Amino acid sequence: MTVQSAASDDAAIEMANDVRYGLAASVFSENVGRAMKVAARLDFGTVWINEHLFPLASEMPHGGFKESGYGKDMSLYSMEEYTRIKHVAVKLA
């Protein structure tokens, strides 16, 4: 984990998203509303606010973006990775 400061929210978001991987990130701020807005713009599968490596909730999707993997594990969303939906219609008479 690295800790970096930036001149503005836009600069911080640009710096954070300018990486090949996107598993997890943290935003530290006294203003939680501002941190939520930043978190929404980060290209990471998990974003913690004022915490890092906080335990993940098992009912929430877990997985990375970009080159940090494909899909979401440990939740109902993971079922979509193993499911193919097919529509079959049969005329019986």
Question: Residues of each region from the PLM?
Answer:
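Conserved C-terminal structural/oligomerization subdomain of aldehyde/semialdehyde dehydrogenase
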Residues: M1-A93
